Amino acid sequence: MEHYLSLLLKAIFVENMALAFFLGMCTFLAISKKIEAATGLGIAVVVVLTVTVPVNNLLYNTILREGALDWAGLPNVDLSFLGLLTYIGVIAAIVQIMEMVLDKYIPALYAALGVFLPLITVNCAILGASLFMVERDYTFGESLVYGFGAGVGWALAIIALAGIREKLKYSDVPNGLRGLGITFITVGLMSLGFMSFSGISL
């Protein structure tokens, strides 16, 4: 249990997808103008990561990795070269299901997210989590915890940035830094703040 808690905290704070690895920056910067939209996208990313990382773990360990098809009488087959294609396919399917659910039950959030909802499919933070899972050889349980933690970390970062950007609207920002300029500086300072967690031994 302690191991899983350590993995969760590490995924949220120490190895934050947005502020440590700078993954998913396209949607991170575009949707962080309002807290409501940022929260909606953050929740969507948490759900997608929590589902896709363990599903991709199952596919990798039962079909793709070398020797995984031993149960089918094919012990020397290595399909790991299909990993990238498989992970993207799983992510696309989950995002498509989520898009249909939001369109039907929460149309306001669906409209607020707009084109960025289907873009979660190619969000490198989503794909990056699955690739990290394979690289670190996580078990199914570890993948589930890591996927959830990575999603929560990314959501925490985008919601925090949205809150700061809403406050910045009322600040006297120099003309040359308005818009993305001050946002990049803000993200950099947030990243420096999150670096303090790297000194914690988990």
UniProtKB/Swiss-Prot annotation:
Q: Biological process GO terms, please?
A: respiratory electron transport chain; sodium ion transport
List its EC numbers: 7.2.1.1
Q: Which GO terms describe its cellular component?
A: Gram-negative-bacterium-type cell wall; plasma membrane
Q: Where is it mainly found?
A: membrane
Molecular function GO terms recorded: oxidoreductase activity, acting on NAD(P)H, quinone or similar compound as acceptor
The organism sits in which domain of life?
Bacteria
Catalyzed chemical reaction(s)? a ubiquinone + n Na(+)(in) + NADH + H(+) = a ubiquinol + n Na(+)(out) + NAD(+)
Query: Which Pfam family, just one, is annotated for this protein?
Result: Rnf-Nqr
Assigned keywords, A-Z? Cell inner membrane, Cell membrane, Ion transport, Membrane, NAD, Sodium, Sodium transport, Translocase, Transmembrane, Transmembrane helix, Transport, Ubiquinone
Compartments (UniProt record) = Cell inner membrane
Q: How does it sit in the membrane?
A: Multi-pass membrane protein
Give me the segments passing through the membrane: 11-31, 35-55, 81-101, 114-134, 144-164, 180-200
> Which InterPro entries does the record associate with it?
NqrDE/RnfAE, NqrDE/RnfAE_oxidrdctase, NqrE
> What is the role of this chain?
NQR complex catalyzes the reduction of ubiquinone-1 to ubiquinol by two successive reactions, coupled with the transport of Na(+) ions from the cytoplasm to the periplasm. NqrA to NqrE are probably involved in the second step, the conversion of ubisemiquinone to ubiquinol.
Assembly and oligomerization: Composed of six subunits; NqrA, NqrB, NqrC, NqrD, NqrE and NqrF.
Protein family (similarity comment) = Belongs to the NqrDE/RnfAE family.
Please give the HAMAP family that the UniProt record associates with this protein.
NqrE
- In its UniProt entry, what is this protein called? Na(+)-translocating NADH-quinone reductase subunit E
The protein's organism comes out as Marinobacter nauticus (strain ATCC 700491 / DSM 11845 / VT8) (Marinobacter aquaeolei)
Tell me what gene encodes this: nqrE
